[in-house]
């Protein structure tokens, strides 16, 4: 019985995502017609944050940012999450790699 309780406690401890706190800022981006809306988002510098990207297009898109060192494929008509930061003050570009001519934007950390 004690082993089962210990095992349950260990599994529960690792099941909670790191950084999933109520005070973690969350920002939403929508991909529609192969464009990010909004295409510019101001975020707090020095904080870890979550980007929730909703792809309203029927085709997949890859959120890609060399500046943020992140990439994530988001299938059509679905959502994805990207965790970034803490960020230094500055501008961080991102694109939708499959439609880079139109799907582009930036985070501005202040």
Residues of each region from the PLM?
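Structural beta-strand segments of beta-rich domains
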Residues: 39, 47-51
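Beta-strand-rich interaction surfaces with strong enrichment in secreted/lumenal proteins
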Residues: 39-41, 69-73, 83
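Bacterial N-terminal signal peptides
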Residues: 8-15
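Asparagine-centered strand-capping/turn motif at beta-strand->loop junctions
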Residues: 53-55
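Short beta-strand/loop motifs in extracellular/secreted proteins, especially
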Residues: 49, 59-61, 103
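Extracellular/periplasmic metallocenter environments
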Residues: 23-28, 35, 74-110
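Sec/Tat signal peptide C-region and signal peptidase I cleavage site
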Residues: 18-22
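Bacterial N-terminal signal peptides that target proteins for export
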Residues: 1-7
């Amino acid at each position: 019985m004690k082993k089962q309780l210990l095992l349950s406690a260990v599994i529960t401890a690792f099941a909670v995502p790191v950084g999933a706190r109520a005070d973690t800022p969350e920002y939403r981006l929508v991909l529609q017609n192969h464009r990010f809306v909004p295409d510019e988002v101001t975020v707090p510098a020095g904080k870890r944050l979550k980007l929730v990207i909703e792809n309203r297009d029927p085709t997949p898109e890859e959120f890609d940012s060399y500046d943020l060192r992140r990439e994530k494929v988001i299938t059509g008509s679905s959502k994805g999450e990207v965790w970034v930061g803490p960020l230094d003050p500055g501008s961080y570009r991102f694109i939708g790699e499959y439609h880079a001519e139109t799907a582009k934007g930036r985070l501005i950390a202040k």
